[in-house]
Amino acid sequence: MTNKLSPAVPPKFQPINTILKTGKSSQLRYIRLGKLLITGFFIIIASLFFLYPQIFYCELIRFSGFHSENNKIYFSPQIQPKSFGRINRTIQKAEFRVDSFFVGQQSRPVIIVCSNPQEYQKYCNSTEGAGCSLGTPWGNSYVVLNEQGMNVDVISHEMSHTELLARFGWWTVATKTPQWFNEGIALMLDRRFVNNPDEIGRYFDYMDEWLYYTGGGQQILELRDIGSIKGFFNASQKQVMLAYMSSGLEVSYWLILSEGRGLEQLMQAMQEGKSFEEAYRQAEEKQRKIMFKKLPTNPLRFQDSKKISD
């Protein structure tokens, strides 16, 4: 009996035109996907420009008609060059104040100096005030100033906001840090309302301001009600001033309890994963019971006062 070997089965080859069609269809899919991604990107950019046009104007400031010698400070073309030196000196004084309070300045915001309400509206998206600050998730920050009302207090106030952005990060400031704390820290550099270099004296002065705006403590604004930007600013002018004074009162009190290292301890604790509330309490814990007997009670903390005295 003889064994007959079966002939080997030849491999199946696809016709060359089938391969070309398959490759072409894959390319078409990638092209369509690329077009969708590009279209989606431009839609997102257009939406962000519609919602936050001031960010885009600030990002493109170097392509505007504003003058700058160092890409750090941009002057409106309407500002005379002879004024540059005076404005630069005012900005430097504000930077020294920030550097002193934070024990070193980490932020390097681009500063835009406007000469009229139209320019200020364009770069700040507001017609109120003499200055504003803007921060981006990608790390850029801007301080927009109105030449007519800018001074060391205004500039250092806004630079305080950009300093917190540099130290804590945009996401932490935007989502985890209450607005009253952000504004309260800024008031420690802004001397338009209280000008007292002594920590305890500053707390007493903010207490006086707070008593004035609350009608002797009759119209208290709780800190939890001014934790968001909307809660802080979406109110009457009198209520906004009360929000500022409440923030100044609380933060000046906290800085006494945290013995000058509060910001550093707060930042470190939050980097370790603690919530703002937990880190804030932890920074003052050591001195809270000691100073409770030495300082007038903070009216924004009556519940805490009861717990300590019990």
PLM features: what roles do these ranges have?
Residues 1-68, 297-310:
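N-terminal low-structure segments adjacent to metalloprotease catalytic domains
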Residues 11-14, 81-85, 89, 118, ...:
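Generic alpha-helical secondary structure signal
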Residues 8-13, 169-171, 232:
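Short, flexible active-site loops
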Residues 42-55, 111-119, 140-145, 202-210, ...:
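Short, mixed-charge, low-aromatic patches
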Residues 26-44, 92-104, 121-137, 182-199, ...:
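Charged, low-complexity, helix/coiled-coil-prone segments
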Residues 173-247, 256-310:
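Acidic/His/Gly-enriched intrinsically disordered linker/tail segments
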Residues 84, 88-95, 99, 156-157, ...:
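Extracytoplasmic/secreted envelope proteins and their assembly/folding machinery
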